[in-house]
Amino acid sequence: MEHVVKDARDETATGESLAEARVFIPISLGNHYYSSEVLSALLSHFIAESQCSVIFLCDRLRYLSYRIRGETHEARIVTNIRLQLEQMNRTLVNLGLNSHSNVRVVDWSFMQDDPRYAGVVASLERLVEEDSWAQQQTDRYVAQFAVRFGGFDVPLHEDSIRLQRQYLVEETALSLYMTEVRGFNVEVYRKGMGFVDDLYSNRATELMSLLGKPALERRFISLEHWLDRVKARTSSKSRSCLTVATVSRPVQA
């Protein structure tokens, strides 16, 4: 049975489909994409229009990314991440976060002691170990991580490979846990989630079994794509207004 992740990008152009939505917004710490402009769009459209939302600051994944890059000074990693959490929280407040009563800002502590999350992680690890297709996909993404975190010429050390697999599994488990277990089933992220999207497209039956659900509910919205569409519509309207103004201008005698 194939399950296609519903693309809600067109529906959310007006916000109508978000009226009853529970929205999950993961934010990568240290990712310069999340500018004040992008965060303002998240607040004014996705959060304001939703039933309720969770902004998830991915401090645990940030920790793993430091480790993958070879950083071993634990205190320095923890200090850097704490500063990044404080900076992001402060930015969100400055942009008007507190005017929205339907949103929470959380980090990994939100679910780290929940046995359901640990169960999703364990089940994913088992799937990757036992399913040859999932194993191949994992290897492919680990190879991409090697370039992303270290460059083309960095050798793949055993510890680095282990950490990259851990990053991939925990990133995927976070998405599944928040959308399918906690019920924040509309996920808004910069762009496609890679491995988790592949699982929905190619291993839906296995995911339903893994999660103990008769149907999968996650819907994904690419924030990057949505913003591009908004800018394109705005540009088109501006050109239309300019054309009308030019045509309507009276001819001087």
State where each predicted segment sits.
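Compositional signal for N-terminal targeting/processing segments
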Residues: 1-253
